[in-house]
Amino acid sequence: MKKIITLTLAIIMVLGCFAGCSGDSYKEDTVMVVNGTEVSFDEYCYWLGYSASYLQYVYSSYTGSSAVDWDAASPLDENQTNFEWCVANTKETIVKSCIVEAEFNDRGLKLSDEDKAEIDETLKTAAENWCGKGADQEKLREYLAGVNINYDYYKKNLEMNLISNALFEDMYGENGEKLKEADVLKYAEENGYVNANHILIQTKDPNGTVEYSDAEIARRTELAKQLSDELRAISDTDEMMTRFAELKAEYCDDLLYRAKCTGCEKVFGIHKKDFDEGKLSCPNCGTANKADSFMYSDNAEGYEFAKGAMVEEFYNCCLSLKEYEVSEPVKSTYGYHIIVRLPLDTAKSIIDPYASSTMTLAATVADKEFSDMLDGKTEKATVEFVNGYEASSFKSMFTDSGFKLTSYKDYKASKESSDK
């Protein structure tokens, strides 16, 4: 599976910078120069428009309206106006993508025939999805132009995503496997990552539909103590872990199957035993749900996670344990946890409350190193507007109805007309 690298907080796709230059003689349509690489008017405006579109999406998500006051303080940075944020974000995107392409070329990397075929297939699919079955690339070009997207840069973005992936994999491996294990573990320990397994004995129904009696809660409390005592009495680690797995399979109340009910639309969970027996009804409304609507969460081997991913009582207990030490019952809002702390595993997927996707610990560290590398090179980059352009040159494209993309050809014609 290919990894998509995020070059900026707001923008996932990346821009490729084209031809290099030398001296101070720039092409007529050059707007900006990044480390000696020229950025054309159309390239710059394309990404300015993308930044504006993202900002409109943010407003729409929070207010229900995509209308933006470009002179108002930005919700993404209160120290900038919305227009200033778009300019700054565009600059950062362009600079980082220039750095990525330069690093890619310096390492002598090339996109494979498979990569190029993937781009062609993506363009073909886009044409059919947006323009109808059998639509060719000219139809796609026309469609994109109608929604303020330049076809050439759209295609270049697809290429740059693959360039980013290839650069990342060359530096770190697909999932960070090129990093030294000791370095990954050091980062994890310094940043509070924990690997642990648990047996959960719930003292309340997880779906909120059954009220446990005092007697049932007392029974479950005693059960948690018995399980903990049994495991803590086993001195041999292998024997203890084998018994832990047996007790977890028999007693753990951690729900393994979850689904959004097609009836009441509430998320509910069921145990593996109920799933295997076809007992798929929602406890809230009784609707029978299909098996393929459930998502399976395999937690037999426990969890590797960052701070904030688990309830505080669980996390703090993990920190207090030595490796392979079993805790006494730990009370949380879910019930009682019998926890065993495990050694960190660089190849295990982690639960990170601040991450948008699941990655291994090694991949997480590699992703951070890649981002830090880009940030460092961005800070040192030489960036300047040229040919008399400055940020305010593009302010007229930001209108009450949104960003109005202007091509260099039209901009030049309009400027020549106004100069007469």
Segments predicted by a language model, with ranges:
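PPIase-associated folding chaperone regions across multiple families
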Residues: 23-27, 34, 138-222, 273, ...
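C-terminal motif of bacterial Sec signal peptides marking the signal peptidase cleavage site
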Residues: 16-20
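Second-shell loop/turn segments in exported
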Residues: 29-34, 76-91, 101-110, 126, ...
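Positively charged n-region of N-terminal signal peptides that target proteins for export
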Residues: 1-7
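Solvent-exposed, polar/charged alpha-helical surfaces in well-ordered, non-transmembrane soluble domains
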Residues: 42, 46, 88-92, 97-105, ...
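Peptidyl-prolyl cis-trans isomerase
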Residues: 226-312, 343, 349
